[in-house]
Amino acid sequence: MFAAFKGMNGSDIDAAVRTMIEDVDLVDKTDYPAKDLSGGQKRKLSVAIAFIGGSKLIYLDEPTSGMDTSARRYIWEMLKKYKDGKIVVLTTHFMDEADFLGDRIGIMGEGKLICCGSSVFLKNKFGVGYNLTIVKENTNIPS
């Protein structure tokens, strides 16, 4: 249905759907309604729907949120495979995900774009470590 909405020819839809279902590892769930899929499986299905039909601009809002590490990596590989020739705008809270997938990374804070650039640029400009600030308050507890 989504492929048809995006203008795919009827003869190409079945093959494209089969390929996507294989790519998101949902072959054994082909005949299940989406409401019966797990949260991770629903996310995989959503990513497949986003890419089917050859869309040139794709928005993905935290596509791997709530997934375990292996499922996240699986989706990452799929995104790498299908992103060529497309503009993919992806939101994430995982810097490793942005680093692996992003050609350009934008960092937002309080609803505003704080900085933008390649992973290398951001690491050179802002560093790769963490800052830890510890403040000790005098508790005036008698010894």
For the regions a protein language model found, what residue spans apply to each?
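Short loop immediately C-terminal to the Walker-B catalytic DE motif
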Residues: 64-65
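ABC transporter nucleotide-binding domain
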Residues: 77-143
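Catalytic Walker B motif of ABC-type/P-loop ATPase nucleotide-binding domains
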Residues: 58-61
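Hydrophobic anchor residue at the start of the ABC signature
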Residues: 47, 75
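Conserved ABC ATPase "signature" region
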Residues: 4-7, 11-29
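Conserved ABC ATPase signature
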Residues: 33-37
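Helix N-cap at the start of a conserved alpha-helix in ABC-type nucleotide-binding domains
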Residues: 69-71, 100
